[in-house]
């Protein structure tokens, strides 16, 4: 599937539009940072009926030195604390490697077209009281430079967007 318009959420929406049917959808980055062989950690709790959404937590798993930059670690901490406080659902990460039941995903009516996609999914799942859990995943340095966490301005834009997304879905 090719998506000419930039944006993480846009790419995810394009991929979803190409699906004809699915039971479980797994999302992961294509920049070499995730380990695809760890997918069972994420989809098996959904297959067994234990969860609707499973986030691959880079915080709970092993990370290559320098793979999760300080600004990303701080942003994760702040965002997950806010989600816990506002929605009473505990996460340690907003990481992109995740699995979700397809029926649950459709209920979320995802619409964010850029880097608010992951937090939008988690906040909407929390509001709908979906069964959410995390599984530890390994994380390595990506290939190339991130447009988000690789620059100060990108990190600030991402932080603003993530916080805005959390507060937008409060009420």
State what each model feature region is.
Residues 2, 30, 137-139:
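Short glycine-centered, acidic/aromatic-flanked micro-motifs in structured strand/loop junctions
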Residues 32-34:
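Acidic metal-phosphate-binding loop of nucleotide-sugar-dependent transferases
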Residues 89, 113, 123-140:
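Catalytic donor-sugar/metal-binding loop of nucleotide-sugar-dependent glycosyltransferases
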Residues 3-6, 10-19, 24, 36-115, ...:
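Acceptor/aglycone-binding surface of glycosyltransferases and processive sugar-polymer synthases
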Residues 120:
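Cell-envelope/extracellular polymer assembly enzymes that use nucleotide-activated donors
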């Amino acid at each position: 599937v090719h998506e000419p318009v930039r944006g993480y959420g846009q790419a995810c929406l394009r991929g979803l539009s190409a699906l004809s049917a699915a039971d479980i959808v797994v999302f992961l980055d294509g920049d070499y940072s995730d380990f695809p062989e760890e997918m069972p950690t994420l989809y098996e709790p959904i297959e067994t009926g234990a969860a609707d959404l499973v986030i691959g937590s880079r915080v709970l798993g092993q990370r290559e030195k320098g793979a999760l930059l300080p600004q990303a670690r701080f942003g994760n901490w702040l965002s997950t604390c806010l989600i816990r406080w506002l929605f009473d659902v505990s996460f340690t990460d907003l990481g992109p490697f995740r699995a979700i039941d397809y029926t649950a995903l459709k209920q979320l009516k995802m619409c964010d077209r850029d880097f608010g996609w992951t937090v939008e999914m988690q906040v909407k799942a929390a509001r709908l009281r979906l069964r959410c859990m995390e599984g530890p995943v390994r994380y390595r340095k990506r290939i190339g430079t991130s447009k988000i966490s690789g620059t100060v301005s990108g990190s600030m834009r991402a932080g603003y967007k993530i916080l805005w997304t959390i507060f937008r879905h409060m009420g």
